[in-house]
Amino acid sequence: MSIAIAGFLMGLSLIVAIGPQNALIIRQGIKREGLIPILVVCILSDVILIFGGTAGVGALVDRAPIALVVLKWLGVAYLLYFGFTCFKEAFKRHGQALAVEQSEPVAYEPVADASSGVITKTRTKAQPKSAQRTWVKPVLAALAFTWLNPAAYIDVLVMLGGIANQHGPDGRWVFALGALCASLTWFPFIGYTSTRFSTVLSRPAVWRYINIAIGIIMMIMCARLIMH
């Protein structure tokens, strides 16, 4: 049990700090768009990284520094792009600001009355063309923030995997499960907490400051990547 708790605390220490992943989850939780797919991507990515590191894949990453350099600059480019979109959304006019609670769109469909032969229009719920695709961009962002981030490979594959292997052949997997429980707890917590308070947080003035804060976080993470 103590090994699992150690793994949980280690995993929590790596993901609690506000970084690109957490910022994205909070942002989409407030918007109520694509939250579940993002949580699935983040958790499955951690499953791969944590168990890959525990299995010893981190040693391969340590021997391929050029791969980390390529990932570094791809990550820098994406962080700059995402930060720009946050600043752009922050400075939209109030009329274009996020609205979480909107009335459902409706459409009118012609319906023929069999007895009178008169055609009337019936009010039905309209299906937005892009409604089923709102999760695509956030999911791609989650994938980019995870797999184009060299820190994910160093912190999880190399460092966490190395610490896990100090607990022996059996104990290392208990440690890994503890670390995974941290991801299973933290990501849904911040996502659904953001959704719970989305009515307040999505007000134009608040949403503007949130976007500015996330944009600044992206720029800080970008600078950290460049300097490492």
Swiss-Prot record:
Stretches that traverse the bilayer: 4-26, 38-60, 65-87, 139-161, 171-193, 205-227
Assigned protein family: Belongs to the LysE/ArgO transporter (TC 2.A.75) family.
Localization terms from the record: Cell inner membrane
Location (main, coarse): membrane
Keywords linked to the UniProt accession: Amino-acid transport, Cell inner membrane, Cell membrane, Membrane, Transmembrane, Transmembrane helix, Transport
GO cellular component: plasma membrane
Chain's role: Catalyzes the efflux of L-lysine.
Organism placement in taxonomy: Bacteria, Bacillati, Actinomycetota, Actinomycetes, Mycobacteriales
Pfam family, one: LysE
GO molecular function: amino acid transmembrane transporter activity
Protein topology in the membrane: Multi-pass membrane protein
Gene this chain is encoded by: lysE
Superkingdom: Bacteria
Protein name in UniProt: Lysine exporter LysE
